[in-house]
Amino acid sequence: MVLGPVPSSSADAGWWTPTARPQPDSDINVTGEPFKGTDAQGRVRGFVDAHDHIMSNEGFGGRLICGKPFSEAGVADALKDCPEHYPDGSLAVFDMITKGGDGKHDPVGWPTFKDWPAHDSLTHQQNYYAWIERAWRGGERVLVNDLVTNGVICSVYFFKDRGCDEMSAIRLEAQKTYDMQAYIDKMYGGPGKGWFRIVTDSAQAREVVKQGKLAVVLGVETSEPFGCKQILDVAQCSRADVDRGLDELYKLGVRSMFLCHKFDNALCGVRFDEGALGTAINVGQFLSTGTFWQTEKCTGPQHDNPIGLAPAPQAQKELPAGVSVPSYAADAQCNARGLTDLGAYAVRGMMKRNMMLEVDHMGVKAAGQAFDILESESYPGVISSHSWMDLGWTERLYKLGGFAAQYMNGSEGFTSEAARTKALRDKYGVGYGYGTDMNGVGGWPGPRGANTPNPVRYPFRTADGGSVVDRQTTGARTWDLNTDGAAHVGMVPDWIEDIRQVGGQGVVDDLMRGAESYLHTWGATESHRAGVNLASGAAASASSTEWWNPFVDYAPGKAVDGDTATRWASEWSDDQWVQVDLGSAHTVRRVTLDWEAAYGKAYRVEVSTDGSDWQTVSSTTTGDGGVDTVRFAAAPARYVRVHGVQRGSQWGYSLRELGVYGG
């Protein structure tokens, strides 16, 4: 990219320049006006960071991530290490666990920053507000701030200054995000005037981006949302807890969330971590729930990460005497725990509230079951934000209208993966995103070296061409991506330029379309309305009903009562059916079947206008349970029948809900 004249400092005395920035403070090292408006087609432009953790220093007991993203007392107070890291890092236990070695480092942050932040330091603040400002000035226009904590890690970590209740941490992180918005607003003259704008709907976000500012979306990534842990496979929460929790999060401004993260909970099973970290998490799983991860052979091409088997001595010594981490069969790489009934209820609860579901961290069994539910309603609100979803689900996600972002990998790896999925993005007309996962204990791109043949050459122009970026300086420290790697979130513009150097302008162009694609998914999620279920409350009949349990009613009407906690169940033989009378003839195109464990492997969907002459509109011999969505050419029907041909289990057939739709 040919570099033209660098804008003068006087050119920066515009709306984007604060009038009351605290002094001293970090430099931004970007000059020029941030781009505004839309393209010729009315689409917003800009990058989307779909996965960041601005406030994770407030989670995990308050002492896992050291330093704060802002402080009313100034930068020296914000960017200082945890007390136990002084004088030389000898007690930086989490550094030892995540980075290896003895954890020793220079704890001094401001103003020297000798050892942190760094691309391989996982326990120090990377989201100082001025560094986020630099990412915005470099072209980022949407940022998802995932409120995050983990009660298990908090409970076993040696240092903490608060309790470990996850929902308390989530509430605090949400409040701190609003506080940071107010902190930035003060620099620009008052409420609403700053560049950091928390948004609660896609229309607000579009307006913010059109103004050239940063739209901040609140998400949640926690291991036991709403208190939904499991102990010995017994859920510690109820449907009422899920509803109360979702309502509270929505009121806080949260619009996307994960249902499970790192540890199996009462909602779903997770995608495993590998290596020593996986072993440590598996130990934590046992200490929290009384159960280790359980694996099974994968039933499809998707699979979970290989389960962590490497030693993790610091964690393993916490196990009770006589208890050890189990070994796992090499051909069993999938989490046996899928989406629980309570988890399915939570997915539907998010759909009811028009929230976006994050499927990263779900095991493939749970993710597949979640996709089944989303597809039953053609629900577009599904996000993969940082490469933790099996890539075999990507087209399924795009078909629904969802959005995918890649983890902030090194430029070479990032561009290679971007190229691999390019054809899919073009097929569905979508842009691309990245998930920095800063403050997320993940690790970030290291330096490619000053002598690499295609380094970042400072200063350089931003992707839109309107601003100029130089090396970033905070206090006495200056970072260069070529020699330091991505030490903090302010290095995102440098990393984007590195991607351009390695992968070409096309990758950057796809990333510039990311904000539009993310907001399109969000807008479609907000406008989604559940179809009218013609079978709801309709008269139902069946070939038989399971009768030998005198305490539970399995009548056919239970399949159309709108309650997934009830079900119809047949006697235990293959040739069985259940049907509904819609009351009058309708044009139908879709039937949904929410199977209990007793599912149909082979079955037909039949329709009739008179209850005597039946037409088969769809059939299968490969049913696998879960939620089936059966689509077929429009057909007139007053009666709709599901006719079982072959059972998928030793029991009969059992449907929680049978839905019939006109579209």
Residue locations for each model-derived region?
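Disordered, acidic Ser/Thr/Pro-rich linker "stalks" and the adjacent N-terminal cap
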Residues: 531-583, 594-599, 619-623, 650, ...
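Extracellular and analogous surface-interaction loops
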Residues: 578-587, 632-636
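Extracellular carbohydrate recognition and processing domains
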Residues: 615-633
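N-terminal hydrophobic targeting/anchoring segments and the immediately downstream early-domain regions
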Residues: 10-334, 341-348, 365-375, 382, ...
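Secretory targeting and sorting signals
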Residues: 1-9
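A short beta-strand element within beta-rich, extracytoplasmic domains
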Residues: 586-597, 642
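Short beta-strand-plus-loop segments that form exposed binding edges in beta-rich domains
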Residues: 643-650
